[in-house]
């Protein structure tokens, strides 16, 4: 740790022990970024581009230290200087780039791509204020901005810029990059596009802002309120800004490696994470057309490059944009989308297969399915529902495109970082190989009937619950029983996530207790959820849960 010690001296002209937690964090940030850069980056002829409206990457310091293999060394150095890595990390702002499972899956895929040593990168937007920060008053949710970008940040500005055309004006982008460390491997990039004129000061009264001022608001918020037309159009602006930058970057990188663009599928594969990036299909065709490739060939090229991940069977998640929105915002795409629709209707005239329906709504998922080579669900049951019900009409004509990719997690974060006592115990039983190959965790089955091992696991679990108890007390003032059953539901607040059923169960148990029927073991219900600002039923459910807490 001599290099870190020297860096602290050079940055702040004092020893680590005399530095504030903020100063130590800034030094660790710089040191870790240098270590990541020194590792190098995965590259190759063909690259996977994972395009997503959100990346729920979480705090990065400890995760990067673990993947670099220097976590214990850094923690020991800090301890010798009277510092705690946990306290240092509390200073770190969390990137406000994601919201739920869709964004966490994207983050886990990037971790996996880097760890497996595959050439790949993520592409998204650099939201300044995130979704929102949730605050409670009178048992009601209120929203305030969640700024996270500071002068000392994981973001690194690049010299990559593009012009993105809209009706009546163009916007210049700047690409920022965050390094994603592979475990004991090189890194990859998460590339985030931004506008230089983003103005955080235009936000007032919670998260209210002028939704029409695209020159200054485009990258302020993830999922801006879409309860009015201005909000819905802002989302279209965001989505096109994201995919136009992505498409230009991908084509430039392919050409730099020797592609003539007719062979683009040999250089790039694009994973469309839900329907937000769907406009990359017509944008690719537009850009290929500018480079002299005719429409039919361009459509064929794109159909071998793009793949689509479906996350939910909810109709609202299968985005449908009025064609007049696109005419108002990205008119250059409308003739392309109409041609794509005509090609589909010439072969498959059924209304439920159309890209543009009889109400002049553009079905983004339909475009992804017709002009992508793969459609995957994110769990076995989910994929079967897609094939047999929600997207059955597409499965009948494209059975070879449908496949399942069950959601996984980067267990290194959720185990090695979040539960270090359990990590050490598992390593003592089966060795260290599981840290890179999760299949080795199956070796734990040899101990499923070993009472001594089970008792030790229970002790680790109990201690973890005590830590949770202390955290809840410190942050809410509520004291919970670590010996109770922790019934935890952490999901975005939505009717289909069914937090309301859990609330009804709590009411049922409460009434039973009032009648003298106590449960065999105490139960502590823990919820974590945000409701979209204009989703009033979801906000009412939060109100119900917070009111139940006060009984």
Regions found by a protein language model. Name each.
Residues 1-551:
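A conserved ligand/cofactor-binding region detector
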